[in-house]
Swiss-Prot record:
Short name of any one Pfam family annotated for the protein: AMMECR1
Biological source species: Drosophila melanogaster (Fruit fly)
Biased composition (Low complexity): 1-18
InterPro entries the record matches: AMMECR1, AMMECR1_dom_sf, AMMECR1_domain, AMMECR1_N
Taxonomy of the source species: Eukaryota, Metazoa, Ecdysozoa, Arthropoda, Hexapoda
Annotated region described as Disordered, given as residue ranges: 1-30
Transmembrane segments: none
Protein name as it appears in the record: Uncharacterized protein CG5902
Domain AMMECR1 stretches: 38-232
Superkingdom of origin organism: Eukaryota
Amino acid sequence: MSNSHYNNYQQQQPHSSNGDPEYQHQQMVHQPQRFSNGHGMKTVAVPDMCLFCFEVLDCELNNVDGPSVPVFSNDAYPLFVTWKIGRDKRLRGCIGTFSAMELHHGLREYALTSAFKDSRFAPISRDELPRLTVSVSILQNFEEAQGHLDWQLGVHGIRIEFLTERGCKRTATYLPQVATEQGWDQLQTIDSLLRKGGYRAAITPETRKSIKLTRYRSQEIQMHYKEYREYQERRAQFGKVQC
């Protein structure tokens, strides 16, 4: 993993007006990918969600009317939309919300917000579209942990609340896949998340024990632009098709 990719995950996230952060953090159409952390939960994440996010971004970049109302569930969930680019899938934008949003509106909003308003990156351009992969993460099963190590790598996403060295309350999160993608253990993940949230002092065992940690699970579905275009071509040839 390159240092630039590592550093992208550590940068401070922008905050909403109420003081709570809006957390910035390839899958074939026919065989959707779901991470093991989604096992045991009602299936929510489906390939149509990735198709919809690509359609929303494609229409916006080409200045045409957006897609029609999607056919997948419109139940309300916390969600994240992540854009990555290139064969090595470098992070290109990732923003989501812990507030439950109806999926049709939420995915439309965060497909664009993560593409254009992630402060770590320049807005995604039309030339980049063919190299993109989109990931949709649907968050469920939030639980207050009994300590900073009361969660499992590769299973849980974590959200921490803590006080900075100046006594300011901060929050930060990593989705379940981040730690395993980076090759971190639990302590490395906690320390990186503290830095991401703006903690600048030395991190001690007491610092880690003082945080409030909430764990959650996520269903993630991914799709590359190539699969999106294949779907578009089939639809143009045969009319509406199911994934």
